[in-house]
Amino acid sequence: MVAPYYADEYVSLYLGDCREHTEWLGCDVLVTDPPYGIGWRGVSTTYRRGVCVRRSSPEIAGDRDTSVRDEVLALWGERPAMVFGSWRRPRPAGVRHRLIWDK
């Protein structure tokens, strides 16, 4: 059993691959930000004083498709969940509502 990353009398937060640690399955609600399945490459381009600056970040593990998201939701079942994702990929089966967050 893994210890929560943070816990108080109202909430327990776990940090890690939820397919390896299953303590979260006993929770009342699931709030998760799984890999979106968009193949994010972690490269950004900005211009500073007329010079193009490219920055690279590591790839996100499991972001090639939505299999991580789909595995988690299959384990979770029909219980309440808030799942962050991308409009670029099909919604998971059983979605009742969606909220658009325009950053």
Where does each model-flagged region fall?
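Core catalytic lobe of class I
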Residues: P4-K103
